[in-house]
Amino acid sequence: MSPERRIEGLALKVGPLGEHDRLLTLLSDDVGLIRLAVPGARKPRSSLAAAVPLTTMELQVGGRSGLLRVRQLRVQHNFGNVGQRLETLAAAQALSELSISLVAGDDPVPGMLSAVLMHLERLELLAQKQRSSEMKSAEGERVDRTLATLVQACVHLLALGGYGLPLQTCCRSGAALSPPIGNWEWRCSLLADEGLAIGSQAGAAIQINPSELALLQRLTRLELPERQDGGLMGPRPVWLRLFTLLESWCRVHLPRPVRSFAMVREAVANA
């Protein structure tokens, strides 16, 4: 029997395994992406029933061979509050799917877990803000920030996972991507197989203007770009365009589709 060990991480996905067990997909700094059997977790009053998605936990695991089994678990934090709003739930699920696409088993990605947790914490805060019937603008700002948080999270996670969209150099000419703010005729094209190219290119998945490119380039920073009054920089249509751009990039380059992107788009449209 292999020695038991402790693993800490974030549950990205949990599904049924047989009649009473669950299959847990965990993101960890130590082992990357690992799949674990959680015996009896579907039984009433099971001590392992807390193995649910979007939960950070400490596990004691072991097993003879093949799929390791969870012996004990201790919940550290549950991000279930993101489910209070459809848009934050969809964004959190998209983060989980994206992480699964970017991290291989037994191949940890430094910084991936902390980045995912940072953006989940932001989504959780957005979900917990009370609704105000008197201020529709505040509700709209919350939806916009949810979308912007996901867009920025995609930029961060793709870069960490080795699939980052090059944001500083034209993929065709090698020239610097320096958006000429105020020149509304200038365009930058996403060639999904290659990257961003200066000008209106044939076959482009989407074209963006100078201010949209400048906003996209700022997303590599830690915080979301804000105006001087503290409001989010950029209106919702711009964030939707940047979301479409990154969605197109992911569709071509990632090994599996992020299906929750469609749910995010629907949730934002219906908000």
UniProtKB/Swiss-Prot annotation:
InterPro entries: ARFGAP/RecO, DNA_rep/recomb_RecO_N, NA-bd_OB-fold, RecO. It comes from the Bacteria. Gene3D superfamilies: Nucleic acid-binding proteins. GO terms for cellular component: bacterial nucleoid. GO terms for biological process: DNA recombination; double-strand break repair. Disulfide bonds: none annotated. The keyword NADP does not apply. The keyword Transcription does not apply. Keywords: DNA damage, DNA recombination, DNA repair. Pfam families: RecO_C, RecO_N. Belongs to the RecO family. Involved in DNA repair and RecF pathway recombination. This is DNA repair protein RecO. It comes from Synechococcus sp. (strain CC9311). The lineage of its organism: Bacteria, Bacillati, Cyanobacteriota, Cyanophyceae, Synechococcales. The gene is recO.
